[in-house]
Amino acid sequence: MSRLYAIILIALVFNVVMTITPDMKVEAATCEDCPEHCATQNARAKCDNDKCVCEPK
C-alpha cells in the first residue's frame, strides 16, 4: 500500500513541477502581444506569418 502512495505522490509532484516550469518554446499567439512578450525574455520581437518569434538580442 505504501508503494501506491509513493507513486501517487511522485505523480503529483511531477504535475506541480510541470505546471510551475514555463514552457520556453511557447510564443505569443498574436503580433500585437509580441513586443511585450519578447521584452520579458530580453529578446527582439519579430512577427513571422502572424506568429510571434523572439530572437536573441
Swiss-Prot record:
What is the protein named? Answer: Potassium channel toxin alpha-KTx 8.2
What does the sequence similarity comment in the record state about its family?
Belongs to the short scorpion toxin superfamily. Potassium channel inhibitor family. Alpha-KTx 08 subfamily.
Which cystines does this chain contain?
A: C31-C47, C34-C52, C38-C54
> What are the protein's GO molecular function terms?
ion channel inhibitor activity; potassium channel regulator activity; toxin activity
Q: Which keywords are on file for this protein?
A: Disulfide bond, Ion channel impairing toxin, Neurotoxin, Potassium channel impairing toxin, Secreted, Signal, Toxin, Voltage-gated potassium channel impairing toxin
Anything else known: Negative results: does not block mKv1.1/KCNA1. Does not inhibit rKv1.2/KCNA2, rKv1.4/KCNA4, rKv1.5/KCNA5, rKv1.6/KCNA6, rKv11.1/KCNH2/ERG1. Shows a very weak inhibition of Kv7.1/KCNQ1 channels (4% at 10 uM).
- Domains: entry comment: Has the structural arrangement of an alpha-helix connected to a beta-sheet by disulfide bonds (CSalpha/beta).
Please state where this protein is localized.
Secreted
> What does UniProt note about where in the body, tissue by tissue, this protein is expressed?
Expressed by the venom gland.
Secretion signal, residue range per the UniProt entry: 1-28
GO CC, alphabetical: extracellular region
Q: Where is it chiefly localized? A: secreted
What is the documented function of this protein?
This toxin inhibits rKv1.1/KCNA1 (100% inhibition at 3 uM), Kv1.3/KCNA3 (human, mouse and rat) (IC(50)=269-467 nM), shaker IR (60% at 3 uM) and activates the mouse capsaicin receptor TRPV1 (EC(50)=132 uM, at 20 degrees Celsius), a non-selective cation channel expressed by sensory neurons of the pain pathway. In vivo, intraplantar injection of this toxin in WT mice hind paw shows significant acute pain, whereas no pain is observed when the toxin is injected into TRPV1 KO mice.
Give the source lineage, highest ranks first: Eukaryota, Metazoa, Ecdysozoa, Arthropoda, Chelicerata
